[in-house]
Amino acid sequence: MRALGIDVGVRKGLDLVLLDGERAVLDTARHVDVDDLHKLVPDFGPDVVAIDAPPAWASSGRSRLTERELRWFGVQCFNTPSDPEMADHPFYEWMTIGFQAFRAIEDAFPRYRTGSVRGQAIEVFPHATAVVLSGFLPPKGLSPHAWRREVLRSHAVDASALRSADQVDAALAALTGLFALERRFSAPGDPREGKIVLPAATLPARPYRRATAPAK
């Protein structure tokens, strides 16, 4: 069982991390051009591809249902608008790269909508993954990068093999893919506009609380 996580970047390129069923880091790639994904991804031999970006614009309004549902749990995320003209806005450039990533591999890994994730490309959000796996929002006073590394370590991923924050996010994406392959996942939202996959079969009845800062 293998899951490939992809962290999306604009000028820096994409970061890829491949995890196996034992959560070992099997391979990585840095600064990958989105146009090379269709050749590179099959070479990794993943059972699922987890991309840290939405697959398309919202169907209407200023955000997608999946993003609104995440915020109900206290997990803040960027909105994906429905207006394609927003593609010209510099802020949304990373989203358009994400759209391209989904399209680049859709022949081998079609976009996930419902059912099993095996052989699919799923949307993930590393921050949300870390919240769900830890059970808390990140504590104040601890950098997001350090917190996410700790979440990986607490779930048996050797974060020492990861050289950057982008690789950490790609590893969290891949870890989400492993949970999804094991059918331990939730995917709130509307499949027509994309659903963020979370690494838990059930979600809490109340919003997540913030973790207590570690003692100094």
Give the positions of each predicted feature.
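Phosphate- and other anionic-substrate recognition elements at nucleic-acid/protein interfaces
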Residues: 1-216
